[in-house]
C-alpha cells in the first residue's frame, strides 16, 4: 500500500464506505422478507417485473431484490448472504470487478446481481472456467432462482444445438467462456435463423475474471474446417529438425551495438528465444535444409510453404515441452492449459503447430485446419451491454482491466480477519537442491499432522515430486491434467488432518478446501455410492417446500449422513486449527503474481490459520527468462556458498520485481494483439451485422438487384468505357461476360448502341429481364418436381454462402498480411496503421467479391429432386491459436486471395499461384 493510501485510505475503502448505506437498507428489509410465505416471496418476481415495465429502474429495485434473494437462499440452500457478499453483489450490478478472497463465497454472491438483472427478460450469462463448475453452480444456485420463478440453463461441451438453444432462452445461463465464444461464432456461420442458439449479449458475470479476461486474452477462439493438404511434409520437416544442433541462447545486444549495426552472433543450426517464443534457422541450418530437401535457395518465395513447416517443427521441439505444454494420451496430443493445468479436450493449436507436435511425438498426424471463424475473448466480452467479474486476485491487473475493458476493481473486505502467514521465499542455485528441500519440509510438516498442499507448474514436476515422496514413504494424492477426473474429491478432502496433496495450477479453483474435510461432499458421495441418482441427490440437499415422499426420504438420508460426517469434520477441524492449519508450498514462482496468490489463497479461508512458502531455484523458467542475473548477483553478495539456501525479504522483492516485468511484457503483447484484432473486429462487426439482418428475414430482393446493377455496370465500364469512343469498345467481350454472368445472350439488346449511358441502361434492363426469367423457370421446375421453393429464401441462402466463402478467404488473407506487416517497421512505418489501411482495402475487395459471387450463383442456380434439406449446422473443429499469440515470421503460407508477392497488383491465385 502506498503512502497516500495509508494516509487517506485506499480507493476501494472509499467505494465500500459509499455502498454501506445500501447494505444497511437491505438488512432493514430482512425481517419483512422472513415474514412472507414461500408463495408471497415467489410472487415478488412478478411484482418486480411489473415495476420495471412501469418505469422503475434496476437500481430502484436493488435493496428489495437483494433482500428477496437472501431470504430465498436461506430457504433453499440453507445459507444467508453476509454483508460483504451484499457489497460484492452491488459492485457486480454496477458493472465492476469485485475482488473477494478465497472462501468468501463468490458463488453465492453472484446470485444477487444475476437475479436483479434477469428481471428485464434479456438474459444473464454467468461465466465459469470449466464445465464442472458451470454444471455444479447451475444446479446449486439454480435452487434459489427456481424457487423465485426463474429459469436456469447450463451450457457444457456435450450439449447439442437444441439443448443449447433451450439453455440460452433461460433467464440465467451458466457456461464456460469457451462454449459461449464458440456458440457466438457458430451462430454467425448458420444459413437459417432456426439454427441459431444464442440471443442478445446483455449482462455477463465472469467468475475468475482474471483467468478469462487476462490470462486467456491472447488466445483467439478459432473454428476450423479440415484443409486439403497432405500431412507428409510435417513428418519430413520433423525428421530434418531432429538432425539439427541448437545454438547458444540469443544474446541481447546493447543499444550502441544495435545502432552500430553489430549483427547477432550465430551458433549451431538454429536459434531459439524462449522469452519471445521465436525460432530461426542460422545460415548453417539453411544450408543443411537445402541439402536435405534438395533445393537451391530456401529463402526463395517458392519455398515459403517448406519454410513454414520447418518453423513449426522447430517450435515443436524448442519451445514446447511434453507433460508441461501438452500430454500424449491414446495416440493423441492434448493441450494443457498453462493457466489452469487442465487438459483442453477437443482443442488444437492452429497454423500447423499441432501437426508438428504430432510428428514430433510419432502419433498420427491429422490434416491441417482452415480457419472458418475467429474472435478473441477481449472482443467477445466487450460486446456485452454490461460486464462484471469476480476473483480473489485482480488488483495487480487493475490497469489492464481499466485500459481494455473499462472495468475498475473494488476490494471487498473479508468476513473475518486474515490469519494466514506468508513466509519469505527460499532460493537455491539449482532445482535438485530445491526439490530435496521441498521434500524435507513436507516430511517435517507432515509429522505435525498439518495438511499440506504442494503447487507445481507442470505435470512432469508433479510426477517427479510424487516419486520422491513415495521414496520417503509419504502417502499423498496427485492432481494434474492426467488425473483430473477426481479433482473435486481430492480438493474437497485436501484439508483433512495429515493429508498431503500435490497439484498443478488447476488446484481446484472454485472448490473450497475446508480444514478437517467437507461434510457436504462426503454425505453426497455416500448417497451416490448407495445408488441414489445424481438428480435426486440435488433434491436431497435442497430446502424448498415439497410433499414428494421420495424427496423427503432422500432428504432424511442426506441429513443423517451429513450429521455423522459433520461431527467428525468439526472435531477434525479443531484438531487441524490447533496444529496451525493448511500449509501451502509453492515449488516455483509463476510468471504471474496472481497465479501465486491464487495458490496462497487456498489457505486461511474464513479466518482459519495457515501458512505459505515458495521455493525458488535459479534454474526455474522465470529466473532464467527474467531477472536471473540480478538475483544471482544478490545471492552472491548475501552468501557466496552455492549449497546454502537463502531466505531474505529482499530476495522475495527481487523475484516479485521479475514477475512485474513479465506482467508488463505480457500486457504489452496483449495490447498489441488487441490493436491488430480491433481492425479485424470492426470488419467482423460489419459482416456479422449484415449477415444477421439477412438471417432474420429482411427482404433482400432490392439489395440483390442493386448488386446485379453494380456488377453489370462494372463490366460495361471495363469493356466499353465512356471515356473512349465507341469504335474502341469491346462489345463482343462485354456480350461474352454478360453471358457468363446471366447465362443468357444480350447481343440483340445491346446491338447498335454507341452511347455509354444508354448501353449501361440497356444491359441493366437485360439483366433484370434475365433474372425474372430465371426466377419463373426455377418456380416452374420446383412445381414439377414437387419441391417447396421460395425465391426470396433462395436469395438469402445464396448470399449467406457467398459471404461465408469470401469471409473465410479474407481471414486467411488478413492473417497472411499480419504475418508480413512487421517489415513495415523496418521502413519506419507504424505496422498497425499499415495493417489497418491494407486490411480495409482488402475488405473492400472482399465485399465486391461477395456481390459478384452472389449474382453469378443466383443466375446459375438449379433445383433438383435431390436438393438438400435443412440440416443442423455442423460443429467444426475448435482450435486455439499458437498461444501465446505473437507476430510470426514472413516465411508463411500465401493466401490465394492475398496480393501476389511478385508486385503485379493481382491476387496470388490470379497470378503466380494460378497453377498451385
Model-identified regions with their sequence ranges:
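A generic alpha-helix preference that emphasizes hydrophobic side chains
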Residues: 4, 66, 171, 354, ...
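Active-site-adjacent structural elements in folded domains
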Residues: 110, 438, 885-887, 895
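Extended, charged helical/alpha-beta scaffold domains that provide interaction surfaces
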Residues: 326-334, 340-348, 577, 583-585, ...
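Short, Lys/Glu-rich amphipathic helical modules
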Residues: 449-462, 696-697, 750-754, 901
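Hydrophobic, well-ordered secondary-structure elements that form the walls
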Residues: 454, 502, 807, 843, ...
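A short, cysteine/histidine-rich metal-binding "knuckle" motif
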Residues: 892-898, 903-916
Amino acid at each position: 500500500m502506498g503512502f497516500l493510501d495509508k494516509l487517506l485510505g485506499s480507493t476501494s475503502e472509499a467505494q465500500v464506505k459509499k455502498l454501506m448505506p445500501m447494505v444497511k437498507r437491505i438488512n432493514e428489509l430482512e425481517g419483512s422478507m422472513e415474514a412472507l410465505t414461500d408463495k408471497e416471496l415467489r410472487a415478488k418476481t412478478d411484482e418486480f417485473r411489473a415495476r420495471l415495465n412501469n418505469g422503475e429502474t434496476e437500481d430502484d429495485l436493488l435493496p428489495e431484490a437483494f433482500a428477496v434473494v437472501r431470504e430465498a437462499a436461506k430457504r433453499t440452500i440453507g445459507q444467508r448472504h453476509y454483508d460483504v457478499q451484499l457489497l460484492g453483489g452491488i459492485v457486480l450490478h454496477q458493472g465492476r470487478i469485485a475482488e473477494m478472497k478465497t472462501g468468501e463465497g463468490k458463488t453465492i454472491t453472484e446470485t444477487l446481481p444475476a437475479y436483479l438483472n434477469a428481471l428485464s427478460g434479456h438474459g444473464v450469462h454467468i461465466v465459469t472456467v470449466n464445465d464442472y463448475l458451470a454444471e455444479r453452480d447451475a444446479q446449486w444456485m439454480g435452487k434459489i432462482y427456481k424457487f423465485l420463478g426463474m429459469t436456469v440453463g447450463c451450457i457444457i461441451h456435450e450439449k447439442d444445438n437444441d439443448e443449447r438453444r433451450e439453455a440460452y432462452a433461460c433467464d440465467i445461463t451458466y457456461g464456460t467462456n469457451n462454449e459461449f465464444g464458440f456458440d457466438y461464432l457458430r451462430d454467425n456461420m448458420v444459413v437459417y435463423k432456426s439454427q441459431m442458439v444464442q440471443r442478445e449479449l446483455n449482462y455477463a458475470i465472469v467468475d475468475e475474471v482474471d483467468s478469462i479476461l487476462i490470462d486467456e486474452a491472447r488466445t483467439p477462439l478459432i473454428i476450423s474446417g479440415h484443409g486439403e493438404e497432405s500431412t507428409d511434409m510435417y513428418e519430413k520437416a520433423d525428421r530434418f529438425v531432429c538432425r539439427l544442433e541448437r545454438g547458444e541462447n540469443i544474446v541481447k545486444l546493447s543499444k550502441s551495438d544495435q545502432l552500430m549495426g553489430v549483427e547477432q552472433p550465430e551458433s549451431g543450426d538454429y536459434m531459439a528465444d524462449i522469452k519471445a517464443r521465436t525460432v530461426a534457422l542460422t545460415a548453417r541450418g539453411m544450408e543443411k535444409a537445402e541439402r536435405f530437401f534438395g533445393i537451391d535457395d530456401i529463402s526463395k518465395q517458392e519455398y515459403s510453404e517448406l519454410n513454414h513447416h520447418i518453423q513449426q517443427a522447430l517450435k515443436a521441439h524448442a519451445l514446447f515441452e511434453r507433460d508441461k505444454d501438452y500430454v500424449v494420451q491414446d495416440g493423441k496430443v492434448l493441450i494443457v492449459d498453462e493457466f489452469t493445468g487442465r487438459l483442453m479436450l477437443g482443442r488444437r493449436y492452429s497454423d500447423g503447430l499441432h501437426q508438428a507436435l504430432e510428428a514430433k511425438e510419432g502419433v498420427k498426424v491429422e490434416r491441417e485446419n482452415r480457419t472458418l471463424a475467429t474472435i478473441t475473448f477481449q472482443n467477445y466480452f466487450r460486446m456485452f451491454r454490461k460486464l462484471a467479474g469476480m476473483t480473489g486476485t485482480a488488483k495487480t491487473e487493475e490497469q489492464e482491466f481499466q485500459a481494455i475493458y473499462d472495468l475498475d476493481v473494488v476490494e471487498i473486505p473479508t468476513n473475518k480477519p486474515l490469519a494466514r502467514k506468508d513466509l519469505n521465499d527460499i532460493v537455491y542455485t539449482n532445482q535438485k537442491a530445491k526439490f530435496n528441500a521441498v521434500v524435507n519440509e513436507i516430511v517435517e510438516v507432515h509429522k505435525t499432522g498439518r495438511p499440506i498442499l504442494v503447487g507445481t507448474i507442470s505435470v512432469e514436476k508433479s510426477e517427479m515430486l510424487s516419486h520422491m515422496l513415495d521414496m520417503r514413504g509419504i502417502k499423498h494424492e496427485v492432481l494434474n491434467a492426467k488425473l483430473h477426473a477426481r479433482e473435486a474429491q481430492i480438493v474437497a478432502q485436501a484439508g483433512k488432518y495429515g493429508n498431503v496433496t500435490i497439484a498443478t495450477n488447476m488446484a481446484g479453483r472454485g472448490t473450497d478446501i475446508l480444514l478437517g474435510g467437507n461434510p457436504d461432499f462426503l454425505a453426497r458421495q455416500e448417497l451416490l455410492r448407495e445408488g441414489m441418482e445424481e438428480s435426486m441427490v440435488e433434491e436431497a440437499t435442497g430446502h424448498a417446500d415439497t410433499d414428494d415422499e421420495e424427496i423427503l426420504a432422500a432428504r432424511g438420508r442426506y441429513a443423517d449422513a451429513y450429521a455423522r460426517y459433520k461431527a467428525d469434520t468439526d472435531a477434525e477441524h479443531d484438531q487441524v486449527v490447533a496444529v496451525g492449519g493448511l500449509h501451502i508450498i509453492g515449488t516455483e514462482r509463476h510468471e504471474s503474481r496472481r497465479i501465486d496468490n491464487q495458490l496462497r489463497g487456498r489457505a486461511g479461508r474464513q479466518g482459519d490459520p495457515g501458512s505459505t512458502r515458495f521455493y525458488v531455484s535459479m534454474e526455474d523458467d522465470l529466473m532464467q527468462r527474467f531477472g536471473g542475473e540480478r538475483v544471482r548477483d544478490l545471492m552472491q553478495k548475501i552468501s557466496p556458498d552455492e549449497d546454502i539456501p537463502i531466505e531474505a525479504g529482499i530476495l522475495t522483492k527481487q523475484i516479485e520485481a521479475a514477475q512485474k516485468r513479465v506482467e508488463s511484457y505480457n500486457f504489452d503483447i496483449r495490447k498489441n494483439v488487441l490493436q491488430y484484432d480491433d481492425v479485424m473486429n470492426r470488419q467482423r462487426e460489419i459482416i456479422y451485422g449484415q449477415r444477421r439482418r439477412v438471417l432474420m428475414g429482411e427482404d433482400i430482393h432490392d439489395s440483390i438487384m442493386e448488386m446485379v446493377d453494380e456488377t453489370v455496370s462494372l463490366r460495361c465500364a471495363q469493356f466499353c468505357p465512356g471515356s473512349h469512343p465507341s469504335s474502341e469498345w469491346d462489345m463482343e467481350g462485354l456480350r461474352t461476360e454478360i453471358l457468363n454472368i446471366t447465362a443468357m445472350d444480350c447481343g440483340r439488346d445491346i446491338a447498335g448502341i454507341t452511347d455509354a449511358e444508354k448501353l449501361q441502361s440497356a444491359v441493366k434492363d437485360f439483366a433484370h429481364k434475365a433474372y425474372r426469367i430465371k426466377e419463373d423457370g426455377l418456380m416452374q421446375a420446383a412445381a414439377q418436381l414437387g419441391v417447396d421453393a421460395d425465391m426470396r429464401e433462395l436469395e438469402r441462402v445464396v448470399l449467406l454462402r457467398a459471404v461465408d466463402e469470401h469471409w473465410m478467404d479474407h481471414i486467411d488473407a488478413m492473417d497472411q498480411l499480419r504475418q508480413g506487416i512487421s517489415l513495415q517497421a523496418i521502413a519506419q512505418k507504424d505496422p498497425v496503421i499499415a495493417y489497418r489501411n491494407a486490411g480495409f482495402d482488402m475488405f473492400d475487395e472482399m465485399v465486391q467479391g461477395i456481390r459478384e459471387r452472389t449474382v453469378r450463383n443466383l443466375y446459375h442456380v438449379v433445383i433438383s429432386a435431390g436438393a438438400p434439406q435443412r440440416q443442423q449446422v455442423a460443429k467444426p473443429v475448435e482450435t486455439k491459436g499458437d498461444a501465446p499469440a505473437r507476430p510470426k515470421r514472413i516465411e508463411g503460407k500465401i493466401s490465394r486471395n492475398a496480393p501476389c508477392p511478385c508486385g503485379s497488383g493481382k491476387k496470388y491465385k490470379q497470378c503466380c499461384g494460378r497453377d498451385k
